[in-house]
C-alpha cells in the first residue's frame, strides 16, 4: 500500500474568514433578511452542499476531526488545570470519605460566594460531580504538580492536533483512495488505536497506577509515595509490592504466566477499601483487550495476499431468503460517509448507554461508588450522550437515503428488500407501540384506580397481585452463581448487583449491594420498552420513507429538510426526514427521562444510604420504591415532588445554584415550546408592525427582519 497524498492542494489564506458564507454563492452576497444568519449556521459545516467532489468532502471531514480533537484536548487541559489550581484534590486524596471533591471557587462579586459550601477539611467551594478526582486517583496522580504537567501536555497535544488539521488539508491532503482503503484502516484502527492504546494503558496501570494505589489503600501519605518515574526506573520498588516483578520477563518467555497473578488478577467484586473494581482486575482486562485487538488488527488483507477482504466477505454473505444479500453495501459504505457515520453512531450510542449502566454496577474508580451525586451525574450524562448519538444515527441514515442512495445499483439486496417491505415493518412496529403503550400504562392506571378505591389487595404489587420479572431475576441468579463454574479462581461475581454477595460499605456509606427486582421494576421496564419502541418507530419511519411515500412520491426532490409540500397540499407538513429526527428527539427525551427517574429513585430507595456500627442500613428514601412507584400518583408525589421540593427550597443556601438552574431549565423549556405552538404568520404580522414604527422614526434596519421559518422554529423548540 502506498499512502497517496496531494502536495499543497489549497493555499493557506485567512481571506475567506472575512467573507461569511464564502462556501455558498447565495450566502456570499450577504444578508438581505435575518434568515441569512440561520442559513449561515445551518450550512457552514454541510460540506455536501459546498461541493460534489467526494475527495474534497473527505478531506474537509478528516481535517475537521483534528480540530475536534484539539477542542477535546483544550477542554481536558482546562479540567486538569482547575484540578491543579482551584481544587482540594490533595486534601480529598488524604481523606476521600469525609472530604467532598471541589475544583471551583466562586468570586465574591454580588454575593455569589454563597455558592461556596463547606466541602470538608476547611475548604469552601462548589462540589463537583464529574468523577475527575476518582479517575485521577485511579491513574496514580498524587499531587497538584502532576495535574499541572498533564494540563500542559494536553495543550501541547491540542496544538499538535491543530497543526495536523492544517497540514493534512493544506500541505499533504490524502487522496480519495486512502479514505476508501478499508482493510488498511481496520488494521490500523484495531491494532493501533484499540490494541496499542489498551496496551499502553495496561502498562501505565501496572507500572504506575497499581503500586501508587496499593500504597494509598494502605494509608500511606501521598507525599511519602515515590514519584511515578521512580516505579518505572527502579524495579525493586515494584518487587516489594508485587514479588513477581523480581523475576522480570522470565515467566513470560517460559509461559509460566500464572507467576504474574499478583498484579494481573481475576477476583471479581469490589475492593472493600475503595468500593471500586480491583485495579489489578482492570489492568488484567486491558492487557487481555490489547492482545485481542492486536490480533484483530492483523486480520485484513493489505500488502500481502493473506487475510480477509471486506468486499468479498460482504458479497458472500447471502442466506436462502435474502436475495442478493449484502451485495452493493461495500460501495455504499465507501462512498457515503453519511451511511458509514449512521452505523458508527448507532453502535457508539448503544455502547455509551451500556457504559452508563456499568458505571454504577461495576464502579471502575476508587471511591466513585460512595459519591452518589457523581454516580447520578455520570449515569445521566452517558444516557443523554447515548440518546443523542442514536438519534444522530437515524439523522445521517436519512441524509444518506436522500443524498447518496442510488436505487439503480441496489437491486434485491438486503437494503432494497427492507425498503420494499417497509410498510410491513412500520405497521408491525406501530402495533407493538400501541400494545406496549396501552398495556404498560394500563397497569399503572389499574393501580391508581384500586389505590383510590382503597383496594390495595387488588393492586399489582409485591404484596398483592405479583408481576415478578422472572427472566431478569433468572439472569441475576445465573450471573451471581456463575463464577464458581466459569471462573473458579474468582472470589465474587462481576457485579454485586446480581445478588448473592454481601454489601460493600466504605466510610459508613453503602458502595453497592445486591439490587432486588420486583413488580415495580416490571411495570417501569415496560414503560422503557414503550418509549424506546416509539422512538425507534419515528426514526425508522423517517429513514425508510426519506425518499418517497404514498403521500409525497417525489419526496427525494424536496431534500432532507422541508416544511411542507408547497401550497395547496394540506396535511403534508412535518413529513420530511428532518422532521422525523425532530419528533424522534422528543421521544428520546421522553425515554431517557423515565430511565433517569427510575435509576435515581431505585438507587436512593434500595441501594444508597448509610450503615450503622451495628450493620443496619438506612436508605436515603427508606426503601419506598417497591410500594410507591407502582402508581402514577406515587411517581408524582413520592419522587417528582419529594425530590423537586428540596431543590426549590435551596434558595439562600450554597445549593441555590441548583434551584436556579431548575427554575431556569423550566423557563427554557417553556420558552422553546412557545416556538412550536405559535404560528409563523402571527410573528410576521407583529414584526411588520414593529418595522412600520421604525420606519416612522427613520431607524429602519438595513437587514429586513423575518419571522423564523417553520423548520427554524422547530429547531429552537426541540433544543
From Swiss-Prot:
Cofactor note: P700 is a chlorophyll a/chlorophyll a' dimer, A0 is one or more chlorophyll a, A1 is one or both phylloquinones and FX is a shared 4Fe-4S iron-sulfur center.
Residues that bind [4Fe-4S] cluster: 564, 573
Transmembrane segments: 61-84, 147-170, 186-210, 282-300, 337-360, 376-402, 424-446, 522-540, 580-601, 655-677, 715-719
Residues that, per the record, bind chlorophyll a': 666
Chloroplast in keyword set: yes
Residue positions binding phylloquinone: 683
Binding positions for chlorophyll a per the UniProt entry: 674, 682
Pfam families in the record: PsaA_PsaB
Function: PsaA and PsaB bind P700, the primary electron donor of photosystem I (PSI), as well as the electron acceptors A0, A1 and FX. PSI is a plastocyanin-ferredoxin oxidoreductase, converting photonic excitation into a charge separation, which transfers an electron from the donor P700 chlorophyll pair to the spectroscopically characterized acceptors A0, A1, FX, FA and FB in turn. Oxidized P700 is reduced on the lumenal side of the thylakoid membrane by plastocyanin.
Family: Belongs to the PsaA/PsaB family.
Subunit structure: The PsaA/B heterodimer binds the P700 chlorophyll special pair and subsequent electron acceptors. PSI consists of a core antenna complex that captures photons, and an electron transfer chain that converts photonic excitation into a charge separation. The eukaryotic PSI reaction center is composed of at least 11 subunits.
NCBIfam families in the cross-refs: psaA
Protein name stated in the entry: Photosystem I P700 chlorophyll a apoprotein A1
Organism annotation: Torreya californica
